[in-house]
Regions:
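Conserved Rossmann-fold NAD(P)-dependent oxidoreductase catalytic core, especially the SDR/UDP-sugar
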Residues: 71-74, 78-137, 142
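N-terminal Rossmann NAD(P)H-binding glycine-rich loop of SDR-like oxidoreductase domains
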Residues: 1-16
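Conserved residues in the N-terminal Rossmann fold of short-chain dehydrogenase/reductase
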Residues: 25, 52-53, 93, 188
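Hydrophobic/aromatic anchor residues within beta-strands of the central parallel beta-sheet
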Residues: 51, 91, 114, 155-158
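NAD(P)-dependent short-chain dehydrogenase/reductase
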Residues: 128-129, 134-200
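Conserved glycine-rich Rossmann-like NAD(P)H-binding loop of the short-chain dehydrogenase/reductase
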Residues: 17-33
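Residues in the short beta-alpha loop(s) of Rossmann-like NAD(P)-binding domains
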Residues: 27, 37, 120
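Conserved Rossmann-fold cofactor-binding substructure of NAD(P)-dependent oxidoreductases
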Residues: 36, 44-71
Length: 201
């Protein structure tokens, strides 16, 4: 809940009649920063946001946060392409196994709906990140089928492309390269890259 997507979704939901919003992430520093930002910018809504430290790799930490939850946006992922190339099993543990853990915990807790975030890189994947996200989608589909048969949560998945200025986006990288007079690192000059802003995502 502390990444680019989590920040944006939180701003959309903060002023609604939702009674409680739970932010679940493994990054205590980002949680603390988010808490301070809420208290400074939205003091009247800050009390309805609760923070939980945990990791999708640890199913018990997911089970601990689930009671009373109705809807989940699952955005936890390793998404840096180079990191996933160098450490592919870490991508599997978070993106594939972590998603499976989350969905099992959600089904056990009787959550109503789970929306999982994937990437356009899962279509015809050519790198470890895309492959791990494609496998994640298969895990989502399999769990959605089981959940539907059991009358459990509605589980769905959405793919989105490159989000401008999100963590790991190429835009800040390109800006820095231009400022420093460095060549822009484009893999293929004929490549097309689809970009959207955070609100569109």
């Amino acid at each position: 809940g502390t990444g680019s997507f989590g920040h944006t979704v939180l701003k959309h939901f903060l002023t609604t009649d939702i009674g409680e919003i739970r932010i679940f992430s493994r990054d205590e520093k980002k949680q603390d920063d988010m808490r301070h930002e809420l208290q400074a910018k939205y003091p009247e809504y800050a009390a309805k946001v609760k923070f939980y430290i945990g990791d999708v790799r640890n199913i018990q930490s997911l089970r601990d946060v689930m009671p009373g939850v109705h809807f989940i946006f699952h955005a936890a992922a390793l998404k840096q392409v180079p990191s996933c190339e160098f450490f592919p099993m870490e991508a599997v543990r978070t993106n594939v196994e972590g998603t499976d853990n989350l969905l099992h915990a959600a089904m056990e807790a009787g959550v109503e709906r789970v929306v999982c975030l994937s990437t356009d890189k899962a279509a015809y994947p050519i790198n470890a990140m895309g492959i791990s996200k494609a496998m994640m989608e298969h895990v989502i589909t399999a769990n959605a089928r089981v959940s539907a048969q059991r009358g459990g949560p509605v589980i769905c998945c959405t793919r989105y492309g490159n989000v401008m200025c999100s963590r790991g986006s190429v835009i800040p990288l390109f800006v820095d390269q231009i400022k420093n007079g460095e060549p822009i690192t484009i893999t293929d000059p004929d490549m097309t890259r689809f970009l959207m802003n955070l609100d569109e995502a």
